[in-house]
Amino acid sequence: MKQTDTLKILVVDDEDIVRLTLAAMIDHMGHTAECVNDGLAGKQTLKNKKYDAAFVDMRMPGLDGMNLLKWSRQKRLGLPIIIMSGHGSEDSRDEALQSGAYAFLSKPFSLVGIKGLIEKIQDNFNAVTASTH
C-alpha cells in the first residue's frame, strides 16, 4: 500500500506569468511541476510522459485547452485535468465539466484554491493506489 507524497503535475498555459506562478505554487507545496506554453506542446508531452494531473488553460492559440481535454479523454489517459480560464463564464465552466474536466478554475486563482485542488487529487490518487494493492 504505497501512498505518494509528491505528484507530478503538468501546467499548460500560453501566459508566462501564469505558468511560472502556478509552477511556483505547486513546487512550494512539495510537488513537481513541468510547464509547456501551448496545447500542442501539452499534447506531445502527455504522449511521452506520465503525469498525475494537469492544469490547462482553456483558451490558447493552436490547440486550445478544451480540445486537449477531449483528446486526453479519447486516449483514456485517466489523469485529472483542471481547466483554467481568465474568461470564466458559467457556460465555459459547464462545458469544461461536461467534457470531463476534473475542475474549472477561474483566473486569477489563489494559493488556497490551488492547494485544495491538489490535496483532493492527492487523496483520490492515494485512495486508488491503496485499493489496487
Language-model regions, residue ranges each:
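Active-site beta3 strand of CheY-like receiver
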Residues: 50-55
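C-terminal output helix
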Residues: 91, 109-118
